[in-house]
Amino acid sequence: MRTTRYCKCHFFNGESDHWGILDRTAFAQKGAKANFAPDTPILPKHLLLELNFDWEEEKVWGSTTYELLVYSNGVQEIKMDAANLEIDQVQVGSKRVSFENTGEKVIVFLPKPLKAGTAIKVKLNHSVSKPAAGIYFTKPDKEYPNRFKTVWTQGQDEDSKYYFPCFDQPNFKQTTEVKLHLPKGMFGLSNGRLLKKTSSASKSFYHYKLEIPYSTYLLSIVAGEFVEHKSKVGDIDIKWYVQKGREKEGRNSFKDTGKIMQFFSKYTGYAYPYKHYTQIAVPEFVFGGMENFTVTTQTDLTLHDDRARLDLDSNGLVAHEAAHMWFGDIVTAKDWSHAWLHESFATYFDALYTRESKGEEEFRYQLLEDAETYFSEDNRY
């Protein structure tokens, strides 16, 4: 994710107001507690998430089905993250089972203790109205009659639990399928490839699947009326989506995406592992950019018309989020105490693409700017 620039591990000869803080060991506030990855007696292998949406009530409801593998003997319960969700029913296999909903966790009680190596399937029916985080609705209203109607998610750090029960820590990875039931004519997007799309007199339906395991916070859902642009660079389909009428701005902002992906594949020696890379520019996306695996969400503020493009481009944001496909998505920190590595690598690779596209002087100037930005953090605490 990117809202501002982050640290890169480069230092420079010369004067700076901030060199005196190099002995600082952390920016942690007094009283901060140690953060550790959770125990893993059960690990998710596959997630099937099926959702419906009501814009008037700002309600999300549906079902979550997990295929799980037991890693410890004697497991009697499954604990999942579920913040302020209504849980209506839980099944293990075909049998309904009892559960406890604490408001932060849902604890599923198994019919009998399980042995290591056992595979089980758990399905939960759930709903939430006006979720506090994780998923956001926008729609026209009296004050803003032309406001864009959409819904979008933002999972980082641990906000997916606000709209479906899940294993909401970065060390848990699973393959996914996402099924979206939407109003007629509305476009739906999620991670991976589109398996099925149907439309009826009143509904649209989209079914996506991603076969590469990834962390829950990288799961994405966006729905609204968007226009697609598609091209091919090497073996990768490059796609981006914008609101109708902003296609030219989309080209201005995202036209170098294919070059960026090729450069990172070559530089890392590890080719981007999926068939496509998608970006979608979303109104009111206050998080800047979010590197959801295979399908990055970008703020529509990064879309530039021809006049604005004379003075700036979006390659910094595009490169930063694309770099996260390697550093954050494919390789992921075990827990959030190491998430700074995601951002540091992505910020550095953004600068590397600056050197590739604009030369050494621009590269070094960007490093200096980033170092100054990093050290200025000390003034905020």
PLM feature spans:
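Acidic/His-enriched low-complexity segments
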Residues: R2-G14, W19-K275
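Hydrophobic alpha-helical and helix-loop surface patches within well-folded domains
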Residues: Y208, K239-Y381
